[in-house]
């Protein structure tokens, strides 16, 4: 799908959260931000995207989806992650479709090494599913083909 205009609301604390990260993780997290926004613009049914904080982490929420968070943690400084609602079917489905291309942590995250090349196609499919979750949660494999 071609990119479309969507309403994006950025809460002030969203940008401030990035000041707490070291330089290399900031670059990776900013890249994920851009990828999430671009994917939202390409995703059917997504007309609005809020960028804020949830549990102190940069978070994204569409008008029809589940919350998606990104973070880097000092206890695992060589990695960063994309976090999903743990009570959803998202990670369980992604694991069936995309393991071992993507690395998972429990039922809540996709983990990346700071020096890893990201599998863009698979990651965008995961982001789309999260952004549309409330419309697709009843579908087999969340409608991912």
Locate the predicted segments by residue:
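Charge-dense, helix-prone N-terminal extensions
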Residues: 1-145
């Amino acid at each position: 799908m071609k990119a479309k205009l969507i309403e994006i609301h950025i809460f002030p604390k969203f940008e401030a959260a990035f000041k707490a990260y070291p330089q290399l993780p900031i670059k990776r997290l900013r890249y994920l931000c851009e990828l999430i926004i671009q994917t939202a613009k390409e995703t059917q049914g997504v007309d609005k995207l809020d960028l804020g904080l949830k549990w102190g982490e940069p978070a994204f929420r569409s008008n029809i989806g589940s919350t998606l968070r990104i973070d880097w943690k000092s206890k695992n400084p060589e990695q960063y992650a994309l976090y999903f609602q743990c009570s959803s079917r998202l990670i369980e489905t992604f694991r069936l479709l995309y393991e071992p291309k993507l690395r998972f942590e429990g039922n809540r995250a996709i983990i990346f090494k700071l020096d890893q090349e990201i599998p863009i196609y698979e990651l965008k499919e995961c982001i789309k599913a999260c952004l549309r979750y409330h419309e697709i949660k009843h579908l087999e494999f969340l409608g991912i083909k």
